[in-house]
Structure formats: C-alpha cells, structure tokens
C-alpha cells in the first residue's frame, strides 16, 4: 500500500513538472519590437519599430517582434501559441495580428499569425519567409 502511494505521488510530480517549468509570458507589450534577449542595438530596434508602425498605418495589420534568449526546453509551437493568446496582437474583432518570434540561443524562429490573416499569410508562406528571407 505504501509503495502504491509512493508511485502515485511520483506520477503526480512528474505530470505537474512540465507546467511548472514553462517559460513565463511577458505582459502584453506597448512596443512593436520587444527584445528580451538584448540582441538588437537601440538603433536597430528603433528603426524596425518605425518600419512596423509605418506598415501598420498602411495595412491596418499589426506586426510585433519578440526576441528571447531561449525557450528553456519548451516547444516552440506551444510557447508561441501561449504568447499569442496572452498578447492578443491585432485589432479586436479582426484578429489581424502577427508575432515574429526569435529565440537566439536555440536558433529558432516562428511567425504566429492571427486567424484574420491566415488566408493571406498561410503557414506555408510564413515558413517560406523564414527559410528564404530571414534565415
């Protein structure tokens, strides 16, 4: 009986561990370029910020860049979806936001697209952009 209780306790600890180790989500940003890794110079960050603001003014679509040091073992897909749900980039009701995520140490990138833009910026196109234009 004691052995069974120990096994159940161990199982519960192991099941709870992935959630406890999840990378934290920063609060929704007030900038378009968010460099949590310190990878961009102030001039690079500000220049990109101005480009994204200008693009948003003409397209009405909101693009946000988020640069992190590492995923800390979390999957890229899981973290990007959690971040997108927390930040809610884009206009309310249109869901026309895009988050470009970069994880410097992991050498991983992802483009997370709001539902309102999925017909224009498909997963295939986002993947092509990452392979041909960014990498």
Region locations from a protein language model:
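Positively charged n-region of N-terminal signal peptides that target proteins for export
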Residues: 1-5
């Amino acid at each position: 009986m004691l052995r069974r209780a120990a096994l159940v306790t161990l199982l519960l600890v192991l099941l709870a561990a992935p959630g406890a180790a999840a990378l934290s989500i920063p609060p929704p940003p007030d900038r378009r370029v968010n460099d949590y890794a310190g990878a961009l110079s102030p001039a690079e960050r500000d220049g990109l910020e101005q480009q994204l603001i200008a693009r948003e003014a003409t397209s009405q679509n909101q693009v946000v860049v988020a640069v992190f040091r590492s995923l800390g073992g979390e999957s890229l897909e899981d973290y990007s979806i959690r971040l997108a749900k927390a930040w809610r980039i884009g206009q309310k009701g249109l869901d026309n936001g895009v988050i470009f995520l970069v994880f410097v140490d992991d050498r991983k990138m992802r483009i997370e697209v709001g539902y309102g833009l999925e017909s224009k910026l498909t997963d295939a196109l986002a993947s092509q952009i990452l392979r041909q234009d960014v990498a």
